[in-house]
Regions:
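ABC ATPase NBD coupling module
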Residues: 1-11, 29, 37, 158-163
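Conserved ABC ATPase "signature" region
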Residues: 45-63, 172
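Conserved ABC ATPase signature
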Residues: 68-72, 76
Length: 174
């Protein structure tokens, strides 16, 4: 069985922020629900305070807690997804194409936010993406997979230095 400790040690930021939030609940209540699931906070007031701290963490105003998902932009929704992912103080966060559904202007800000939070919390970030320019910016180590097989792996410097596997080259030129 997966207890709160197991659930909170690994979390995920999904690709599409539009599909990850319940449209009938405020974003604050959704973060509080994640905190309850992870066993964080002994009282409602503790969880409410932690939820506000998480909004601070993802650089959203605290009054966003009362907003409904339909009132948020894609980048703001993704920030709420990031807040929920970090609610349980995870050891590992899997980010599956977390910026691909966002406008290019928002991608850099969300990528930087992920990197800042990862550094601040000393969390391992497994960043899945086809966009190697973002991977190069965010990663210490890179694994390139093609058809389910690892075709290249190493430090960011090693993987981004020629010679490239043909698939890596295709991703770089895309």
């Amino acid at each position: 069985a997966r207890g709160p400790e197991t659930l909170s040690s690994l979390h995920m930021v999904f690709q599409n922020p539009f599909d990850t939030l319940n449209p009938s609940q405020s974003v604050g209540s959704q973060i509080v629900r994640a905190l309850e699931k992870f066993g964080i906070g002994s009282t409602d007031a503790d969880r409410e305070n932690r939820m506000l701290e998480l909004l601070d963490l993802v650089k959203l105003p605290r009054d966003f807690a009362k907003r409904m998902p339909r009132q948020l932009s894609g980048g703001q929704k993704q920030r709420i997804g990031i807040a929920r992912a970090f609610a349980g103080n995870p050891a590992v966060v899997v980010a599956d194409e977390p910026v691909s559904a966002l406008d290019v202007s928002v991608q850099a800000a969300v990528s930087q936010l992920l990197m800042d939070i990862q550094n601040e919390h000393q969390t391992t970030l497994l960043f899945i993406s086809h966009d190697l320019s973002i991977v190069r910016y965010l990663s210490d180590r890179v694994v390139v997979m093609y058809l389910g097989h690892v075709v290249e792996q190493g430090s960011t410097e090693q993987v981004f230095s020629p010679p490239y596997h043909p698939y890596t080259e295709a991703l770089l030129s895309a």
